[in-house]
Amino acid sequence: MLKRILSLTAIFSSLFVTSAFAEVSEETAYILNSFLFLVSGFLVMLMALGFCLLESGMVTSKSVSAIAAKNIGLYSISGIMFWFIGYNLAYGIPEGGYLGSFTTWTDSSALADGYSASSDWFFQMVFCAATASIVSGTLAERIKIWPFFLFAAILTGIIYPIEMGWQWGGGWLSAAGFSDFAGSTLVHGAGGAAALAGAIVLGPRLGRYDEGGKLVPFASSSIPLATAGTFILWFGWFGFNGGSQLAMGTFDDVNAVGTIYINTNLAAAGGVVTAAVITRLWTVSYTHLTLPTKA
């Protein structure tokens, strides 16, 4: 009797496992993929707050209000410009081409696409805003707010969408075999290049160096604020990288997202520890400003 019960249990267990990992329907995969885009986009949107807090905490007290206004403004501008022309500049590009169309985004969702077009727009828009946020941090206390807003409009509406479309939109970089999983080049390369150009053109912050060229220490407005921003950015990276799997409708996709989360956490933790060790060895004296900026 016991053997019969165990045999039946094994049979039913195998049936359950088989059904649990059976391929989901096309509609279910569509829902799960769209859900991944929306939730991941929400996490990436929180990074705007993280950037704002980190920058506000690291600049001098007199510049905090300007930093807050800049971050709210750039996110708003990014949303409008990416809807107005940015998305179609990136995704309206001919296969192997260089430039999409200067047209406004419209919803063209279809079940065969595997995800909602509007969820994809939202996910890509927050990436666009993150690109501008990279520039904002570099140009803190270097540029007035309205010239920065003008640059943000050009970056998020034209520059970033065009180079993004070269790979993610099926443009010439994609045709050449170039791959960018989560924006290491398209987002951070573009944002970093723009930030570097701005820093070169504008030069150092006023008062950063004395007449002899010696570095003048600046007092940060709030280390706890910068630390809070760091943790929010750390949190947001799970959406940034995890959402870049672009699918959650299969067993392998979900496992991949989990692996991405682990790698993301290890990368942030490794950055903190490495920065602390190098700072200690290089400067002999440890500085508390190192950790929030290296996570």
Task: Put a short name on every predicted segment.
Residues 288-295:
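Single conserved hydrophobic/aromatic residue that forms the stacking wall/gate
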Residues 273:
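Oxyanion-binding "anion nests"
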Residues 1-23:
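N-terminal secretory/membrane targeting signals
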Residues 23-210, 220-231, 235-263, 269, ...:
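Metal/cofactor- and membrane transport-associated sequence elements
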Residues 283-284:
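Membrane-interface helix caps and helix-loop-helix hairpins in membrane proteins
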Residues 16, 287-288:
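Serine/proline-rich low-complexity intrinsically disordered segments, especially terminal tails, linkers
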